[in-house]
Design a protein with these regions (language model features):
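Trp- and S/T/G-rich repeat-edge/linker motifs of beta-rich repeat architectures
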Residues: 1-5, 9, 13, 22-58, ...
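Recurrent small/Gly-Pro-centered beta-turn motifs in extracellular repeat architectures
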Residues: 17-19, 70-73, 146-149, 225-228
Length: 265
């Protein structure tokens, strides 16, 4: 365990999620009673049975009596130095009795038995490039989940060094197709953790919005802030040469979600 990456209060306990490149993230909890150091108990290990492909407990959020854990792999879903991934993120649901469910992710056998995604979605909400469940928040009785997608970085990736299978997949559709159709973060919401509605699949129609960095509930609606580093210029390739051009879609953005009965996003 290299880092306590995220913490949350839930069920009268403090929960801590770690980074563990060898075995996968761990979740620990404590009542924080008496004099420190406190008594901690591990409630999840080995990345919830997925190993290093769930390297990091990226985000924790309490929602309707359960603690939701969003996973990821460092560096956006591909830890190149340690050759972990690439792989998309998962979403786990922890209960007060330490039992857990796979909300979104890869079906598998675990020490606790078989786990299947109760939402029906594979890792990344069926989007391979969603390397993190980066941020979660609760508003108006719904859980909001924001991702990080690295698809918009494909033009800058050393694809020629990838496996033959991966190169063929990219070549079949073309890099531009992946950027256009897979670029930009996702935002999903649910009132029960099982049935999900997609708010955006492409960074609010901006593939440069590669991730959701904050979700905040307010009396005026839910506000969602993005990360967008492709600014003020963006490198593009023309006639085999790279050049920087002004990118009007670059720079972070803040979006407000309309509450039920209110018109517009």
């Amino acid at each position: 365990n290299l880092t306590v990456f995220e913490m949350a209060a839930f069920n009268n306990h403090l929960y801590a999620g770690t980074v563990n490149a060898r075995n996968g993230f761990e979740i620990w909890k404590t009542r924080a009673e008496g004099d420190p150091p406190y008594d901690w108990r591990r409630v999840l290990s080995h990345g919830a049975g997925r190993g290093p492909l769930n390297e990091v407990a990226v985000s924790l959020c309490e929602f309707k009596g359960a603690l939701y854990v969003g996973s990821g792999i460092v560096n956006g879903g591909y830890h190149r130095k340690l050759n972990i991934g690439p792989a998309a993120a998962e979403l786990i649901r922890l209960h007060p009795d330490d039992s857990w469910e796979l909300v979104m992710g890869e079906s598998r056998m675990t020490p606790q038995g078989a786990r299947y995604p109760i939402s029906g979605y594979r890792p990344g909400f069926n989007k391979f490039f969603n390397g993190y469940v980066w941020r979660m928040g609760v508003h108006a009785g719904r859980l909001y989940v924001g991702t990080f997608s690295w698809a918009q970085l494909l033009p800058y990736c050393p694809i020629h060094q990838w496996s033959e299978v991966a190169q063929k997949k990219i070549a079949r559709m073309g890099v531009d197709w992946f950027v256009r159709n897979m670029g930009g973060c996702d935002v999903w919401s649910s009132e029960d953790g099982v049935h999900w509605d997609c708010m955006t699949r492409n960074g609010f129609d901006n593939e440069c919005n590669w991730g959701v960095r904050q979700i905040l509930s307010t009396p005026y609606g839910v506000f969602i802030a993005t990360a967008n580093v492709l600014a003020p210029d963006r490198a593009i390739q023309r006639n085999g040469q790279w050049e920087y051009v002004h990118n009007p879609r670059g720079g972070c953005e803040v979006w407000r979600g309309a509450d039920p009965g209110e018109a517009g996003p």
